[in-house]
């Protein structure tokens, strides 16, 4: 590899710009291509990292000790994988950096995220996950990263890659508000429209537990109007900081996860907070964020609280 493309385990305090996790899978390659566009858009460096785990070996006798240390072997395999990313970015003219790092992929990316603007990963890697199930890295990383994480799904299409809006889910929580301002900055950078969305749950599921609960179209419409008014106030606040940004608001009624998944198919980016108004505050992703990541039709950015 050239000096520009060399692997490194030092200099972790440098600005990493757009950080992409690469394990050689097709979705990781898709994440690298997405990362190149993002780095070019942000006018920052693109850093691709391949992690490798150090094996714990027990040898019964001296004769069974391999001539090449297992950790050196693991590092060489990672460097070999990383050459695929180098080839993918052969024609990329922006500043780029490639490195290997010891440790599990999620842990490495979480640590490096402290020095990155954004981390990008594929929804699944080579861990054997199939169907609509997130890989372990794309599940753990958004919940612990120090910067926003973008997860690129297999079903992501190019139809809305540049023309669709940036959509952000707003729920009135502090986390949701941070996500809203992050989405506004992202939309401004992309020259895209920003759509603020509050999903109002239909409420039918409560009727089993509260059969005397009165649910009517009038009640729903009244609450929808209240939420719309609140959303328009948030939009007005954003307009003061982003005067050139085109803003729209919507308050659809339905299941939050299903509604946001449907919206993701026409958005160039869907932005979520790690956790919303749920009462359980933990190191886990909120149920809506986790559900959207599992089923999304387009790239999703998760903003840390």
Question: Residue locations for each model-derived region?
Answer:
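Glycine-rich, Arg-bearing micro-motifs that act as flexible, cationic patches
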Residues: 121-140, 163, 269-295
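Structural beta-alpha unit
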Residues: 1-14, 27, 56, 69-72, ...
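Short, structured interface segments
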Residues: 138-157
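Short beta-strand elements of ligand-binding domains
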Residues: 122-123, 149-154, 300-304
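Conserved N-terminal glycine/acidic-rich loop preference
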Residues: 118, 196, 224-231, 267-276
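Small/aliphatic-rich secondary-structure junction motif
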Residues: 2-66, 164-217, 239-241, 246-250
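A short acidic, glycine-rich active-site loop
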Residues: 66-80, 215-229
